[in-house]
Swiss-Prot record:
An individual GO BP term: thiamine transport
Protein name: Thiamine-binding periplasmic protein
Subcellular location, principal: periplasm
Annotated compartments: Periplasm
SUPFAM superfamilies associated with the record: Periplasmic binding protein-like II
CDD domains: PBP2_TbpA (cd13545)
Function, in words: Part of the ABC transporter complex ThiBPQ involved in thiamine import.
Annotated source species: Brucella suis biovar 1 (strain 1330)
One Pfam entry name: SBP_bac_1
GO CC terms in record: outer membrane-bounded periplasmic space
Keyword rRNA-binding: no
Domain of life: Bacteria
Residues that coordinate or bind thiamine: 64-65, 166-167, 202, 220-223
Residue stretches in coiled coil: none
Length: 334
């Protein structure tokens, strides 16, 4: 019995002296839900970066880009986020003013987007143009302009996203303001008759559309490429409007917390190269903003090209966003 006790003690002593398994360094990325879905870029981006960094990537999802910024403001300096991925240029002035983001410190030579957007904090990773996407089997004669969309048949419904939580919803708000100016409130009143519902994020809206709940949805000119490549159908189409289509440039940035984690800067640099950019066209269904190692899928050649690009300067969006959201609320709640 005494011998057994001695052997047992010796075994625990050896275990206690054995070196603990080395825990991998972790990078926490806040992003939107469609990015981390099984069909989104997240899984492949995670796999590619983890091979390069020998680390663990932890994605934390919110409904959409505006919700990401709102969450970070609530968490403040106590946030667990090293990187926030999914903001866009419409939010940069407000995000910078929060004081929760740090300069990227990376070379952005490979980054190229319409308008040559450059920023010391916010790094573009993709871009696209907002568009009305429609089901050609249910709607053979869709609205051919924003004016026709606003003033058309109320029986032909569209699903939109909330500008308070979703960057596409904010994009639609700014699209309407770009075209209608001071008459945007009146235009929203007319359009409201066609709105089936307003969802918190893009995923919910597009899901309702593909389930047949509505023949139209606010999405991107690139969205039909998914259906062409994956589903082998050209049933779903996007529209380029003569008034122009509103541009979205999606961005990522490291937080002030993340700036203390060397993996954050490493990820931002990785994001501008093929390991990230090659994943974007056929998972996020947007145009890549950085260096790729292969051409775009052939389906992208069939997509409509905007006749005019619309984009309100970030400082003007920051100055007026609350006012314009209230205008939308007042017009659509009547």
């Amino acid at each position: 019995m005494r011998l057994l006790s001695l052997l047992t003690f010796s075994l625990f002593a050896v275990i206690g002296l054995a070196p603990a398994a080395q825990a991998k360094d972790t990078l926490t990325i806040y992003t939107y839900d469609s990015f981390v879905s099984e069909w989104g870029p997240g899984p492949k981006v995670k796999e590619n970066f983890e091979k390069e960094c020998d680390c663990e990537v932890n994605f934390v999802a919110s409904a959409d880009g505006v919700a990401l910024l709102n969450r970070l403001k609530l968490e403040g300096s106590k946030t667990a986020a090293d990187i926030v991925l999914g903001l866009d240029t419409n939010l940069t002035t407000e995000a910078r003013a929060s004081g929760f983001f740090a300069p990227s410190g990376i070379d952005q030579t490979n980054v190229k987007v319409p308008g040559n957007f450059k920023d010391d904090i916010f790094v573009p990773y993709d871009y696209g143009y907002f568009a009305v996407v429609y089901d050609s089997e249910k709607l053979p004669n869709p609205p051919k302009s924003l004016k026709e969309l606003v003033e058309g048949d109320p029986a032909q419904k569209i699903v939109l996203q909330d500008p308070r939580t979703a960057t596409p919803g904010l994009g639609m708000l700014l699209w309407m303001k770009s075209v209608y100016g001071d008459e945007a409130g009146a235009a929203w009143q007319k359009l409201q008759k066609r709105v089936l519902t307003v969802t918190p994020g893009w995923s919910e809206a597009y899901g309702l559309f593909t389930k047949g709940e509505s023949p139209m949805v606010l999405s991107y000119t690139t969205s039909p490429a998914y259906h062409m490549v994956v589903e082998k159908t050209d049933r779903y189409k996007a529209l380029a409007y003569p008034e122009g289509n509103y541009l979205q440039i999606e961005l990522a940035a490291q937080t002030t917390t993340g700036a203390k984690n060397p993996l954050a800067k490493k990820f931002l640099a990785f994001m501008t190269g093929p390991g990230f950019q090659d994943v974007i066209p056929e998972t996020n269904w947007m145009f890549p903003a950085g260096k790729t190692s292969k051409p775009l899928p052939a389906a992208f050649d069939a997509l409509p090209k905007p006749e005019k690009t619309l984009l309100i300067p970030p400082y003007e969006v920051a100055k007026n966003r609350r006012l314009w959201v209230n205008e939308w609320l007042a017009a659509t709640s009547r």
